[in-house]
Amino acid sequence: MKIFKNLWIVLLVISLLLVGCTSKEKATTETEKETGEQQSYTVVDDRGIELTFEKVPETVVTLLPSITETLFELGVGDKIIGVSQNDTYPEEALEIERVADFETVNAERIVELNPDIVFASASNEGQIEQLESTGLKVFVIESALSVEDVYGDIGQIAQVMKAEEQGEKIVEAIKSQIASVQEKTSTLDKKKNVYFEISPAPEVWSIGSNTFQQELIEAAGIENVFAKQEGWFAVTEEDIINVNPEVIVTTVNFGDDPEGEIMSRAGWSTITAIQNKEVYLIDPDIVSRPGPRIGEAIELMAKTVYPELFK
């Protein structure tokens, strides 16, 4: 069981690194030129590489769930012919061929599919070179660390797919949802603090600053008890007892009763969150994917911690 949990932690951190490694400013400039009746256009990816398209891509492979969700929101999900094993939303994504998992990308299969464009993470460096060597276009998006980064991602993807108007609508809808949440949380006299658990006992992990999840927590009007630390890290049970969180949120749907497992941990009975039974399981996909559901993620966090504001 311990070996299994160790592997689980490694896979979890890999998946989180895919959504939170380096901050960046988005390059979203686009140029067009006339080519007879059709216009070619150029979009710059996060490597600073210009990709020129003679026509709008008709077939797409995406190696990140957040990009898959964005493509569906843009109304071009029907063009996707390959996704990663982690793509679970929307339901239509479950029917698409899997060409990657946590650790590997099936580059040979992607080459066989011969998509017009491959959307990839900067962490797929080796596979990117392999795919590009065959002549495939690969558009690289670095990991988002902030809501602003996500807006930039959506804008870039929309430009590639010539769906800029819909991309702008998605961003405006997200901003509106976040503003609605923050209007409610602005009435709070005092913010609650939270311990955010991303790996179960005995090898407990949490998150701090410079992570996508930290930005969601702050936007939801909540304070992170480990905000002074950076990235993803292991914490001891003594650390958690000492910071005495008012709320505990876990994204670990591990076992039959994740909330009950936390409530019954030895030595935790003095923690305020345990005493007040404020321990909650939250959908890990929504709060770990920097895509079009970030407004929903922030609202979910706020509703979980401050349910009285949403009655």
Which residues fall in each region the model found?
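Alpha-helical, coiled-coil/dimerization segments enriched in small aliphatic residues
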Residues: 86-89, 205-232
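Bacterial Sec-exported substrate-binding components of ABC uptake systems
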Residues: 2-8, 12, 19-66, 165-195, ...
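Extracytoplasmic ligand-binding site segments that recognize negatively charged/polar headgroups
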Residues: 126, 141-156, 191-212, 255-257
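Short helix-initiation/N-cap motifs at beta->coil->alpha
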Residues: 46-48, 99-108, 229-237
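Short helices/loops that flank or line small-molecule/ion binding pockets
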Residues: 107-115, 133-134, 235-244
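Short secondary-structure boundary segments
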Residues: 64, 122-123, 143, 229-232, ...
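Structured C-terminal subdomain patch of bacterial secreted/periplasmic proteins
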Residues: 59, 155-159, 168, 172, ...
